[in-house]
Design a protein with these regions (language model features):
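Ferredoxin-reductase
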Residues: 10-13, 83-160
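An N-terminal, well-structured beta->alpha segment
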Residues: 8-105
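Polybasic, low-complexity association/targeting segments
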Residues: 1-2
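Short helix/loop capping segments that flank catalytic or ligand/cofactor-binding pockets
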Residues: 52-54, 100, 151-152, 166-168
Length: 191
């Protein structure tokens, strides 16, 4: 599917809010912007995801967060019941949409039967790393773009040792993200 077809698919999706749909309609005559947002998905690596906050396949938004979290949930579920009980700690920084993205991630994890410890207020990355170990969590998620400009947000993932994911887990999440994004904006795949 080319970027224009992907754009049209998103535009027609019932999963979009009215605001999201209006954002996409506003770029209808800007071919370069459509290409930038829909030429391919954000790439998931050992540090997670980072990108500008816009509606689109190649940007940080609630749909991309949900797909990445479903991939992460699959990795945790593959570790077994004990890993699911240990669960995940989730925190966020003060960037726009960080709380929304953290809650979306928490909902996907909970929907997969994985215990969630969601911080109620802003926390720095080192505190999440500590919390994962202190609470005996299987994993952690921090919604932050670190040093990147304010237009960005990110999704950092951690394993039970409080460090970034092992490469094999990151690769599994990346594979799953590609599966979910092949039917972009299909909300049924996100939870």
């Amino acid at each position: 599917m080319n970027y224009r077809q992907e754009y049209e698919k998103w535009l027609a999706s019932p999963a979009l809010s009215e605001d999201e749909r209006n954002e996409l309609k506003a770029i209808a005559n800007d071919e370069k912007e459509i290409e930038n947002r829909f030429y391919g998905p954000l790439e998931f690596g050992t540090a997670g995801l980072r990108g500008t906050m816009y509606v689109g396949l190649h940007n940080m938004n609630r749909h991309v967060i949900r797909w990445a979290t479903q991939g992460f949930a699959n990795v945790i579920r593959a570790e077994g019941e004990e890993a699911m009980k240990k669960g995940v700690a989730i925190c966020m920084d003060c960037r726009n949409h960080s709380m929304e993205f953290a809650r979306a991630a928490a909902c996907v994890m909970a929907g997969n039967g994985i215990s969630v410890k969601l911080f109620e207020s802003l926390r720095p990355t080192p505190e999440l790393s500590f919390a994962v170990r202190e609470y005996g969590c299987e994993a952690g998620i921090n919604v932050t773009a670190s040093h990147n400009p304010k237009e960005y947000n990110g999704y950092k993932v951690y394993w039970s040792d409080g460090a970034q994911l092992p490469p094999q887990h990151a690769a599994a999440i990346a594979r799953d993200c590609l599966l979910y994004t092949s039917d972009a904006a299909d909300e049924a795949r996100s939870v």
